[in-house]
């Protein structure tokens, strides 16, 4: 079995392994720079590590590949019988990371 980790960033958790490319909430890092993500769980074959003291020694590192935007989301608010319509759009800013190591 391969080694993988559950990392926390942007209020979400992602399952990552070395070499994975993931899109996460925008991070304040330049493309090409390295970042370290906090770990919630590490699985190494049959060995599962979830103890906070042991996880404090573990780090998942990744390289920022680019900053991009997610898909367009359309929001439409409507109130019946009043003529009230409100349209709004949103595109979440994302950071594309390549996981380089779980140490």
UniProtKB/Swiss-Prot annotation:
Keywords: Ribonucleoprotein, Ribosomal protein, RNA-binding, rRNA-binding. The keyword Methyltransferase does not apply. GO terms for molecular function: rRNA binding; structural constituent of ribosome. GO terms for biological process: translation. It comes from the Bacteria. One of its GO terms (cellular component) is ribosome. Signal peptide: none annotated. Belongs to the bacterial ribosomal protein bL21 family. This protein binds to 23S rRNA in the presence of protein L20. Part of the 50S ribosomal subunit. Contacts protein L20. This is Large ribosomal subunit protein bL21.
């Amino acid at each position: 079995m391969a080694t993988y980790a559950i990392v926390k960033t942007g209020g979400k958790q992602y399952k990552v392994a070395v070499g994975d490319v993931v899109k996460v909430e925008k991070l304040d890092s330049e493309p090409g720079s390295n970042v370290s993500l906090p770990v919630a769980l590490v699985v190494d074959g049959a060995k599962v590590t979830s103890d906070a003291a042991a996880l404090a020694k573990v780090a998942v590192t990744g390289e920022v590949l680019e900053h991009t935007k997610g898909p367009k989301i359309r929001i439409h608010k409507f109130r019946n019988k009043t003529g009230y319509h409100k349209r709004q759009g949103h595109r979440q800013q994302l950071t594309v990371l390549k996981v380089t190591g779980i140490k």
